């Protein structure tokens, strides 16, 4: 009876370990994916704690193996990323392609690699924290927005803390203002 009991307990332990290891492997595999994820109504900005979907304009996210950090604006994400300790993280950065989205509610189906995006800085459009850096996959879309709403087109590597501070000061405390009337699309034709 003891031998039978030990065999049953040993078998049960082996089965539990097998399921446990399989479960760990699956969980690890999901976390290793560095693909963008959708924004949800309950998501809060990693920097300021605001509900992300309550505000217009492009958003950002940093996807790591340990999880996803979401941001209410591209400016918030870029400001976070430019901190020296964050640049050491193995994270992939994403922003909305505003060439394929409406300003009031960017489409999560069009999240692009932030490091290869074109950014329009100094537009009249406002995002969650006032200053907005409109993000685009295509340079011609960025130039079209700059032509309609002002600003200049920059690449990811041209953005630094001084530029983000300059963009914020241009908004004159426009924090949480929504896009002006008629600014429904990031640019005409999309």
From Swiss-Prot:
Keywords of the record: Cell membrane, Chaperone, Copper, Lipoprotein, Membrane, Metal-binding, Palmitate, Signal
Membrane topology: Lipid-anchor
Location of region: Disordered: 170-190
GO molecular function, one term: metal ion binding
Signal peptide: 1-23
Location relative to the cell: Cell membrane
Pfam families given in the database record: NosL
Lipidation (S-diacylglycerol cysteine): 24
Inducers of expression: Induced in response to denitrifying conditions. Activation requires NosR and DnrD regulators.
Lipid-substituted positions (N-palmitoyl cysteine): 24
Compositionally biased region (Low complexity): 180-190
InterPro entries: N2O_reductase_NosL
GO (cellular component) term, any one: plasma membrane
Role, per record: May act as a metallochaperone involved in nitrous oxide reductase assembly. Specifically binds Cu(+).
Family: Belongs to the NosL family.
Subunit structure: Monomer.
Name of the protein in question: Copper-binding lipoprotein NosL
Annotated organism of origin: Stutzerimonas stutzeri
Higher taxonomy: Bacteria, Pseudomonadati, Pseudomonadota, Gammaproteobacteria, Pseudomonadales
Gene name tied to this protein: nosL
